[in-house]
Amino acid sequence: MEEGDFFNCCFSEISSGMTMNKKKMKKSNNQKRFSEEQIKSLELIFESETRLEPRKKVQVARELGLQPRQVAIWFQNKRARWKTKQLEKEYNTLRANYNNLASQFEIMKKEKQSLVSELQRLNEEMQRPKEEKHHECCGDQGLALSSSTESHNGKSEPEGRLDQGSVLCNDGDYNNNIKTEYFGFEEETDHELMNIVEKADDSCLTSSENWGGFNSDSLLDQSSSNYPNWWEFWS
């Protein structure tokens, strides 16, 4: 046998083997594929039961014309996809809740800052009147003390003098009132007294004879008749 014929025979055998393997793979792939009816029935079973017992797997495989291994693999893949979908849903819900809470936190943080600033402003406004009142009270007390000291130092002596003068005047008035009450007459006016004095001087200067005839008893009698009981006052 020639060398070229040998290589041709080997190549033909290899190619035939490859074609046989391809056919087997196609058959296996056809066996693995599921029809739409099989998939729908498997989906309905999965909604009620996510895991099947061995007896249940055999029963489902017979009903659908599949092998029990195919049913087990399909349920296994379906559970994995279902878990990933559930995790995605939970993650999306948690992410939405987190974003909502984060936005609320930012809003509350801003409100807190505004409230803190407002509280500081109110505290400052409350402290200002207290300080002003304190200064006003201190100023009023200082003025009152200074005015009281000045009035005490400047007006004590004149007031004392005035009080002494008023006491003396009151004593004089009291004595005059006593005299008028006991003697029974009031003081005459200055004009009347001057007239009496002038008449007395004229009478004394013109008539010297009257000096000799001056009777002291008559004067005493007249004064006693006009002003009775005047000695009782001095007794």
UniProtKB/Swiss-Prot annotation:
Residues 128-167 are annotated as: Disordered. The keyword DNA-binding applies. GO terms for biological process: positive regulation of DNA-templated transcription; response to abscisic acid; response to osmotic stress; response to virus; response to water deprivation. Residues 128-138, 152-162 have a biased composition (Basic and acidic residues). It is found in: Nucleus. Induction: By water deficit, by abscisic acid (ABA), by cold and salt stress. This is Homeobox-leucine zipper protein ATHB-12. It comes from Arabidopsis thaliana (Mouse-ear cress). The lineage of its organism: Eukaryota, Viridiplantae, Streptophyta, Embryophyta, Tracheophyta.
